[in-house]
């Protein structure tokens, strides 16, 4: 049903204030509003250039954040020339972070005000209603430091610069901590409990980076973002403009059935998983980098990554291909490269075949390099979280060798001691090397390690959409290959022992490919002509040679598994 248009009244261009919770979205006709009226949460039409033809298309997009365009450093002469020019208009000074409706989140981008089409209709955000239970819980929590969120408008009082908003959030966090400290209560760090709803799309849980949950800078200067506490979606939208410094810190829970833990209790209670968070607001951050330059490749980033704040508005971040250090300009990178002596990842080379090598890196021994790797991978993994240290993880980096050194293609990480026998915590092929078969090579290598351990392994669940497609394609390829080579009867257990796949993954793959058939009261695995033809039509890819792998499973001491202290 098409959304209905509300009658116009005073207060909001083209309509009355904000619609009630039971009403449809309020829509203002084109030409009845200006850029100064657009707030976070509105849905407007935006010009988007077509990748192939370059022509401008009109796409409906939701406004997630508003900011002033970053001002470049100017010489005195340039400042004098700029002073003689007329003042820039609102369209030229503001940028809008938009999410294109019905498109993937990785297409979100900053657009200038000139690309917003005010001649088309504008859909206003719905009003969020706070229940009586939530209000009473806020009062009991004594969190007087938190204030109702104010719509983020370019000209209104609710619009603040990034620096001012960050300071206010830090002050609010400190005030909340002081209030609870005076009342003799320990300030809890919120951890959303598992709700059992596995339908929420989440990526492969990622390995972690050193971070206290207080939003302070770590020793490398990387700002660690805090979880946004509270269940108000409007607050999440309003605060998204300054998400590079984390969400609003509070010590209350908006949902009754969720527990809260202090950091110490959290570390004791939770297993050392890669993600360590189930917060929905974790994926609501605004992308802070546009592009990264790594070696010969210039890559557009997909998601937010908590690099230092001073790098948030630069056009391109330059990354050393060997040590993964980051720099704001090509000059500083060139100066670093003249001193950087690293030619390969700082670990043990456990595999070498042709021009491909794998290095094993202990997060406890190479913290700086692993943290830089986590920051880089966060640019391309939506649900990857950087909360705890890298100590409990091993990193297996795939590189391509040439005369200049070893160039990173991708990596996967795994816990040193996984309670659920996960053999992968986070896996990534760098975008500039995707669609070349390296993803399956990483997956195959992880299962070769699992075979040496004598276990059945599986990636950490739930998988992302792309991760599920990659793993399902690999599982199908290996299972079909094994069945075609086997002439005798074979069971699910025998397939698991030969491939190191878990029984659940084998059954999932067989059901997805419609390979399970019932015959005379028994389930049979049947390969259809379509499945066989697809398998034979695939082009050959690089494979792992087990004879070139020199690695033994390790038994970790408890002191080597401690982290977060």
From Swiss-Prot:
Q: Does the keyword Repeat apply?
A: no
User: What's the stated role of this polypeptide?
Assistant: Catalytic component of the NuA4 histone acetyltransferase (HAT) complex which is involved in epigenetic transcriptional activation of selected genes principally by acetylation of nucleosomal histones H4, H3, H2B, H2A and H2A variant H2A.Z. Acetylates histone H4 to form H4K5ac, H4K8ac, H4K12ac and H4K16ac, histone H3 to form H3K14ac, and histone H2A to form H2AK4ac and H2AK7ac. The NuA4 complex is involved in the DNA damage response and is required for chromosome segregation. The NuA4 complex plays a direct role in repair of DNA double-strand breaks (DSBs) through homologous recombination.
Zinc fingers (C2HC MYST-type) at which residues? Answer: 317-342
**What are this entry's molecular-function GO terms?**
chromatin binding; histone acetyltransferase activity; histone crotonyltransferase activity; histone H4 acetyltransferase activity; peptide 2-hydroxyisobutyryltransferase activity; transcription coregulator activity; zinc ion binding
Q: Name one GO biological process term.
A: rDNA heterochromatin formation
Q: Where is this motif: ESA1-RPD3 motif?
A: 367-388
The protein, known as: Histone acetyltransferase ESA1
Catalytic activity, reaction form: L-lysyl-[histone] + acetyl-CoA = N(6)-acetyl-L-lysyl-[histone] + CoA + H(+); L-lysyl-[protein] + acetyl-CoA = N(6)-acetyl-L-lysyl-[protein] + CoA + H(+); 2-hydroxyisobutanoyl-CoA + L-lysyl-[protein] = N(6)-(2-hydroxyisobutanoyl)-L-lysyl-[protein] + CoA + H(+); (2E)-butenoyl-CoA + L-lysyl-[protein] = N(6)-(2E)-butenoyl-L-lysyl-[protein] + CoA + H(+)
Subcellular location(s): the record lists: Nucleus; Chromosome
Question: Which residues does this entry mark as bearing N6-acetyllysine?
Answer: 384
Q: What is the lineage of its organism?
A: Eukaryota, Fungi, Dikarya, Basidiomycota, Ustilaginomycotina
Domain remark from Swiss-Prot or TrEMBL: The ESA1-RPD3 motif is common to ESA1 and RPD3 and is required for ESA1 histone acetyl-transferase (HAT) activity and RPD3 histone deacetylase (HDAC) activity.
Annotated gene: ESA1
Report the InterPro entries cross-referenced here.
Acyl_CoA_acyltransferase (IPR016181), Chromo-like_dom_sf (IPR016197), HAT_MYST-type (IPR002717), MYST_HAT (IPR050603), Tudor-knot (IPR025995), WH-like_DNA-bd_sf (IPR036388), Zf-MYST (IPR040706)
Q: Is Transcription regulation included in the keywords of this UniProt record?
A: yes
Q: How does it assemble?
A: Component of the NuA4 histone acetyltransferase complex.
Q: How is it modified after translation?
A: Autoacetylation at Lys-384 is required for proper function.
Its EC top class is: transferase
Return the annotated site residues (Important for catalytic activity).
426
Residues annotated as catalytic:
460 (proton donor/acceptor)
List residues binding acetyl-CoA: 425-429, 434-440, 464
UniProt source species: Mycosarcoma maydis
Location of the region described as Disordered in the Swiss-Prot/TrEMBL record: 1-33, 173-217
Question: Which Enzyme Commission number(s) are listed?
Answer: 2.3.1.48, 2.3.1.-
Q: Which Gene Ontology terms of cellular component type are present?
A: chromatin; NuA4 histone acetyltransferase complex; nucleosome; nucleus; piccolo histone acetyltransferase complex
What are the protein's UniProt keywords? Acetylation, Activator, Chromatin regulator, Chromosome, DNA damage, DNA repair, Metal-binding, Nucleus, Transcription, Transcription regulation, Transferase, Zinc, Zinc-finger
The similarity annotation says:
Belongs to the MYST (SAS/MOZ) family.
Question: What residue stretches are annotated with the Tudor-knot domain?
Answer: 38-117
Record-annotated MYST-type HAT domain positions: 284-553
